[in-house]
Amino acid sequence: MQFHHVKSFSERAKPKDGFTLVEILVVIAVIGLLAAIAIPQFMSYHSEAIDAEMKSDLRNASIAIEAYYAKQSVLPASLAETTGFHPSGGVTVSLVIVSTNSYTLNAAKPGGTQPSFTYESITGSSH
């Protein structure tokens, strides 16, 4: 006569498939921590990129105006009279004639570190 040894429930080998709840919670906490660090940094980079876009448009507009002035000996009444300048998407560039040979440009776009930048042809600086 043969006897079969029956293992109790606690003695049976349990397959270890998947992750435990604690492991999943630790992974979620680590992902949350990384996101808390990365998202503000990304937003800062995004704002700085918008600033660079506005400053680039100011430089490009001033180059187009100077080219127009060199050819026509007069400043353009508007940026539409210049050739080759098209503002970046979402950037609004405006031209103000200060005198017969000086002007001010303003570039604005929401989302930058400041709402707009200004270029003055007299000083050659933007702020």
Where does each model-flagged region fall?
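Regular, well-ordered alpha-helical segments
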Residues: 36, 44-47, 63, 67-70
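Acidic-residue sensor for enzyme active/binding pockets
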Residues: 23, 53, 66
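N-terminal leader/signal peptides at the extreme start of proteins
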Residues: 1-19
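Periplasmic/extracellular, small/polar-rich flexible segments of pilin-like filament-forming proteins
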Residues: 5, 63-127
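Conserved catalytic core of two-component sensor histidine kinases
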Residues: 28, 55, 62
